[in-house]
């Protein structure tokens, strides 16, 4: 991992790895093959792994950890103090709250929101834990303090406020299990 100081920033700009008008903390740590678009804000104590692509207008707050081989689309917001695993895709306007753990191979489509509150609208002490291999439809909302099990599909505009079981398709407000996920529906196994 590198630390982004003044000299490193000059090198990155020279190689066109960084776009224009970024506000990046001097202690930003990053791996190889980093690409950063324009108009991003990366605050102190943020780390990203190898082969990470950050688009435009992204905000990464303190304590954000991003693994390898991730794609962070434009207007994504991380509230900080969260962990994002390897091979995770966060599409346009996704919000990752504090106290969220996202394991490997998860896909968040546009506008997905994770919430750092429990049912009583109080900040929860328990993390939102998203296990590996799930797919989240546009504008779905995932409440804090629950676990999304492995290989789930969460439908567009779903509101998930309870733990899920592995390999299920969930939709609705509140979300409920509709059926089992088929093997050919697992996004990360597609060519």
Q: What residue spans do the PLM features occupy?
A:
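Active-site oxyanion/phosphate-handling segment shared across diverse enzymes
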Residues: 155, 161
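Conserved catalytic segment of ABC-fold P-loop ATPases
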Residues: 149-152, 165-167
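Conserved G/P- and acidic residue-centered "switch" motifs that form tight phosphate/ATP-binding loops
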Residues: 154, 172
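Short helix N-cap motif at coil->helix boundaries in the Bergerat
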Residues: 162, 179
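Flexible, glycine/small-residue-enriched loop-and-beta-strand segment within the central core
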Residues: 1-30, 35-147, 173-174, 181-182, ...
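Glycine-centered loop/turn positions within well-structured domains
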Residues: 158, 166-168, 176
């Amino acid at each position: 991992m590198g630390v982004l100081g003044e000299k490193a920033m000059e090198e990155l700009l020279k190689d066109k790895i960084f776009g224009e008008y970024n506000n990046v903390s001097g202690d930003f740590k990053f791996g190889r093959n980093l690409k950063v678009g324009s108009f991003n804000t990366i605050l102190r104590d943020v780390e990203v792994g190898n082969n990470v692509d950050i688009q435009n207008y992204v905000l990464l707050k303190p304590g954000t950890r991003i693994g390898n081989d991730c794609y962070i689309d434009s207007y994504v917001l991380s509230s900080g103090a969260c962990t994002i695993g390897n091979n995770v895709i966060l599409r346009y306007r996704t919000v990752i709250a504090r106290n969220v753990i996202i394991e490997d191979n998860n896909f968040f489509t546009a506008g997905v929101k994770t919430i750092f509150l429990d049912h009583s609208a109080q900040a929860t002490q328990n993390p939102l834990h998203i296990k590996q291999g799930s797919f989240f439809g546009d504008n779905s909302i995932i409440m804090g303090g629950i676990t999304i099990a492995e290989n789930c599909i969460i439908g567009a505009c779903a509101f998930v406020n309870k733990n899920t079981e592995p390999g299920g398709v969930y939709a609705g407000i509140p979300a409920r299990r509709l059926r089992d996920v088929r093997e050919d529906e697992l996004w990360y196994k597609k060519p």
